[in-house]
């Protein structure tokens, strides 16, 4: 659910908030374990694009502005296009994809870096490296 809101009303200077990534079009921030998206041009806030056990570690917006990749306890890749649905656990949809977030396969991610228009380097807590590929809008995570 998105809501019209002026950026000044976000109160992002509040210590409860933490900006994860910002560009000309979007501001992505966390409040506790919830990640939120503010669409600057539309002045709309999406209440929840991700939820992380232990807080999100970080986020990137892809160079083409098509995806927000959030990470920490696993990865959530959120597609930056209508209808901007609110994230919910264990939901299969086109708005987002989840990777390595289940209790039996958690990957603690320290950093994600975009290495090409369709590929990200994922570095885990134990310094293992993975690739996250976005090909034809399909996402795949593989250890390298």
Where are these regions (language model features)?
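Repeated scaffold domains used in trafficking and secretory/extracellular systems
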Residues: 2-25, 48-66, 93-118, 144
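A short, charged
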Residues: 67-78
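Surface-exposed loop/turn elements that mediate protein-protein interactions on large endomembrane-trafficking
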Residues: 1-11, 31-51, 76-103, 125-144
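Glycine-centered flexibility motif
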Residues: 33, 58, 72-74
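Amphipathic alpha-helical binding modules
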Residues: 110-133
């Amino acid at each position: 659910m998105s809501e019209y809101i002026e950026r000044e009303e976000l109160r992002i200077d509040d210590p409860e908030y933490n900006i994860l990534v910002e560009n000309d079009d979007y501001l992505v921030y966390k409040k506790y374990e919830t990640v939120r998206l503010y669409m600057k041009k539309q002045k709309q806030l999406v209440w929840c694009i991700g939820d992380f056990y232990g807080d999100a570690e970080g986020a990137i917006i892809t160079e083409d502005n098509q995806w927000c990749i959030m990470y920490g306890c696993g990865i959530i890749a959120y597609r930056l296009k209508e209808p901007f649905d609110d994230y919910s656990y264990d939901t299969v949809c086109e708005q987002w994809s989840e990777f390595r977030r289940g209790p039996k396969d958690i990957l603690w991610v320290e950093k994600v870096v975009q290495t090409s228009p369709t590929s990200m380097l994922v570095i885990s807590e134990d310094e293992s490296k993975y690739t996250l590929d976005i090909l034809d809008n399909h996402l795949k995570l593989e250890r390298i």
